[in-house]
Structure formats: C-alpha cells, structure tokens
Amino acid sequence: MNPEQYLRLVQHDLDTLALLAKAAAGRTPPEDVSDWKCTLMFYMACVYVKALARSRQKDLQDHYNLRQWLNTTKDLLAITKPYRRLEERSRDARYEGRRFGGQELGEARSWFLQVRDHLVQLLEAAGVRAAPGVDPGPHL
C-alpha cells in the first residue's frame, strides 16, 4: 500500500468507530464498547505510522518491527511513549476484556492526538498531502 491508501484506512477506522459508537448508544441499555473505542484509536495510530514508513520506503509488516522503528528513528522518539500507552490500553481491552471510563478514554484520545499530530506533520513534510487529522473525540 502507498501512504495515501494507508491514510484512507485511517479514515475508514474513524468511520467504523462512529458507526460502532452510534449503534452501541442506540441499544437499551447502551452497550459498553469502550474496549473497541481504545482498540480503534490504537489501530489508527498504527496506520499513521505505517503511512509514514511507506513514505520513507519502509514496509512495516508487524508490531515488533513497527515498535523497533519507532524506538530507533530520531524524529519519532517523541511519540514512542504515547504510542506504547495506546498499544497497552488496546492490548488490555482485547486480551483482558477491560472496559474504560470517560477519563481513561480521554487519556487514550490524548495519546492518540499526540501521535497523530506528530505524524501528520512529518507526512506533510514528506509531501503526503492527503494526511487527515482525524479526531475520535466526538465518538468517545
């Protein structure tokens, strides 16, 4: 995939989050899908990283290589901590069945926004103009 295709996937993940949140809120009683909200935020962050990697002719095929690249690339070091926190929260949701309250969702959104803002700036500097600055906030 090229960077623009990855960025369309980010938008798709946001659209999926919106659909999920709307469907869950429409249930009686409302369904708690906070686990998937965190997971989708992590997936969007991951796809932003993959888009940047592709713009630099790198093909990251798994989370291990992605983390290794984040931890060893000078202009990405600023986002290693928020990215890792998002990944851990997503892992807790997927493998431990954790659900999250509003404060925890807000923290996850904050981490996501740090990653997104940094990567969108780098993508634009690399000439990728289709970098959407998606915000999951309205769907949390």
Identify the meaning behind each predicted range.
Residues 1-140:
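Terminal alpha-helical segments
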